[in-house]
Amino acid sequence: MGFGDFDTICQKAALPLCSLVGPASSISGATGIIPNCYARNIELANTIIFEGAASFVHIIALAMTVIMILHIRSKFTAVGRKEIITFFYIYMLLTMCSLVIDAGVVPPRSGPFPYFVAVQNGLTSALCTSLLVNGFVGFQLYEDGTALSVWLLRLTSTAMFAISFVISLLTFKSWGGLSPTNTVGMFVVLYILNAICIAVYLIMQLLLVMNTLEDRWPLGHIAFGLLVFICGQVLLYAFSDTICENVQHYLDGLFFTTICNLLAVMMVYKFWDYITKEDLEFSVGIKPNTWEVKEFLPEEDRRATVYQDTNSEYAGSMYHHRASAYNNHNY
């Protein structure tokens, strides 16, 4: 296996792009690398669903992402609120795209399939880039929530999406000097650059916690998120075929990787939620009746208030009847 080849990777893991890379078959003439083992299809309501277990996890991930977005939106004055919510919007788009591809809504060998896989690759790069830029927010190099901060995140994420999408599509379509057998460019963008983005984000958050925070609990969130992410990658690229064979093709490494990726993203949210503070005067809490009065004032205390105990409980208020000269009528 040479640098940038997907032969070994695709033999172990049933990735969507594997059917679009590799040498052409001498029999059918179609490109693609067949994995050693992949999860069996299931039939539901006369519809064949690919990767049923992984598709179910994608649906759970969408629900969890909506919940996290709602919690973030409720913290109006938290640092980096607009920036981190962009990260979760990109993750939601990536999950939706992965669900469409993995479930077979767009089947392999169909015309739109290369474009959907290219979009998936682009969203993956955009997600990692968004995570990297979010790592700068805590250092207050520029004010968060401003046009500079938000558009810097959007433009860099969009740029990486475009680069990854174009390189992937050129590779799949054998355009621009790239081909399914010349995958070095796509490998560098998808694996090398994304790994660098994640590594830089982790280092920056460690520096942020160690240098600016007295509480060390956020380090646990970082450690757990990194652990489950690494476990997911190992299960996918090293043991996917072994898992698949031992469970009679009901599951493969993609199922466990999807779960681990979801947990890692949840730890990103948990870390941000833990280290951010907000002004209680302007915040909107999730729990209702935060300032609910638990008991009434005693009778003697109530009589001592600005409202006197007369026939009208508003008699002692500051409002007084006054005459109006409008059309010589009194109001």
Swiss-Prot record:
PANTHER family: CHITIN SYNTHASE EXPORT CHAPERONE. Its main location: endoplasmic reticulum. Disulfide bonds: none annotated. The chain crosses the membrane at residues 52-72, 84-104, 122-142, 150-170, 184-204, 219-239, 249-269. Interacts with chs3. Keywords: Cell wall biogenesis/degradation, Endoplasmic reticulum, Membrane, Protein transport, Transmembrane, Transmembrane helix, Transport. The keyword Cell wall biogenesis/degradation applies. It comes from Aspergillus oryzae (strain ATCC 42149 / RIB 40) (Yellow koji mold). GO terms for cellular component: endoplasmic reticulum membrane. This is Chitin synthase export chaperone. Chaperone required for the export of the chitin synthase chs3 from the endoplasmic reticulum. Belongs to the CHS7 family. One of its GO terms (molecular function) is unfolded protein binding. It is found in: Endoplasmic reticulum membrane. It is a multi-pass membrane protein. GO terms for biological process: cell wall organization; protein folding; protein transport.
